[in-house]
Amino acid sequence: MSDEQHQNLAIIGHVDHGKSTLVGRLLYETGSVPEHVIEQHKEEAEEKGKGGFEFAYVMDNLAEERERGVTIDIAHQEFSTDTYDFTIVDCPGHRDFVKNMITGASQADNAVLVVAADDGVQPQTQEHVFLARTLGIGELIVAVNKMDLVDYGESEYKQVVEEVKDLLTQVRFDSENAKFIPVSAFEGDNIAEESEHTGWYDGEILLEALNELPAPEPPTDAPLRLPIQDVYTISGIGTVPVGRVETGILNTGDNVSFQPSDVSGEVKTVEMHHEEVPKAEPGDNVGFNVRGVGKDDIRRGDVCGPADDPPSVAETFQAQIVVMQHPSVITEGYTPVFHAHTAQVACTVESIDKKIDPSSGEVAEENPDFIQNGDAAVVTVRPQKPLSIEPSSEIPELGSFAIRDMGQTIAAGKVLGVNER
């Protein structure tokens, strides 16, 4: 990886519209996949009678999924262009993966929306665009994929562009901030070089559009926030919490605090990829050892931050949520599980403060009795156990969450304000 600026890129869109193939193609065209790996995948795919899957295979690290011909792995794949180092927050389309989309898109700076030319806007296309808008993704590149299946027809392309523009208007996403490109990820059209099949199109190709995305605001200005994924005991070192730096910088010698467990100590060592490093920056996955903090003092879901600017712990918080799939209605007192960063905590909806018109963002109703599928609302939430969470306007990386119940994602949201304990 070069010292270029970093972008986290969400790939969103309906299942089977070709997201994995597009990602594989991007990795392939930017030289991020060794040639021999592609050849090997090609042979495997042909053996199994799925000749066209060599790119999707690049994305596919799960042997069992490979057998079923479905790709669902959210691999943090990386590739570089002339301008940026990209990490792909791959967002597969399967319904249960909306939660990953929520946790993924919240880390994403921009997004590529994949829409199949032969299928147009589908329910998940709508859901993903709505989420992208709710979670604050600023720029959208719309890849109208599978152009080879409609014989590269301009009228088919234009029809899909109109459908997507209507959808963007519905969710108040400024289509001025969207670029539309006719592509075939499978054949490679308009990805890394202009296609001879789309003579009627004179816009940018995908890699050019990616190069021109606006640079993300560097999150290092924010204080250190590092959600803990696991806590290990390693002989000779002691207790080693592991997690990804979301904001700020973790330095050896720092005094840090873990919330909500409320323990603190001095960072003795920081390790990344089995090597000791003096510091860790946003996006780095690290293990570190803190003097005086034992294995039973901290747990997954804690957030590490500076001792003099510790992570917020919410007594209650106000949030804007979007209800995606709930079998009936949500009323005050509803207590599902909130998934925020690495924490999973049951939380009660204490009050439904406002219903929001999702298409305009205006207040549709004050203090409604209930909300249901498709509604956006501002709610006040009380965690049943201590939860560290931050307003998304201050630290967006720790300000979004998914709400799950009955084995599915019910809603997604972002934190507006925290009333601290």
Curated annotation (Swiss-Prot):
CDD domains: EF1_alpha, EF1_alpha_II, EF1_alpha_III. GTP binds at residues 13-20, 90-94, 145-148. One of its GO terms (molecular function) is GTP binding. Residues 145-148 are annotated as: G4. Its EC number is 3.6.5.3. InterPro entries: EFTu-like_2 (IPR004161), G_TR_CS (IPR031157), GTP-eEF1A_C (IPR054696), P-loop_NTPase (IPR027417), Small_GTP-bd (IPR005225), T_Tr_GTP-bd_dom (IPR000795), TRAFAC_GTPase_members (IPR050100), Transl_B-barrel_sf (IPR009000). The keyword Signal does not apply. SUPFAM superfamilies: EF-Tu/eEF-1alpha/eIF2-gamma C-terminal domain, P-loop containing nucleoside triphosphate hydrolases, Translation proteins. The keyword Hydrolase applies. Its main location: cytoplasm. Residues 184-186 are annotated as: G5. It is found in: Cytoplasm. Mg(2+) binds at residue 20. Keywords: Cytoplasm, Elongation factor, GTP-binding, Hydrolase, Magnesium, Metal-binding, Nucleotide-binding, Protein biosynthesis. GTP hydrolase that promotes the GTP-dependent binding of aminoacyl-tRNA to the A-site of ribosomes during protein biosynthesis. NCBIfam families: EF-1_alpha (TIGR00483), PRK12317.1 (NF008969), small_GTP (TIGR00231). This is Elongation factor 1-alpha. The lineage of its organism: Archaea, Methanobacteriati, Methanobacteriota, Stenosarchaea group, Halobacteria. The gene is tuf.
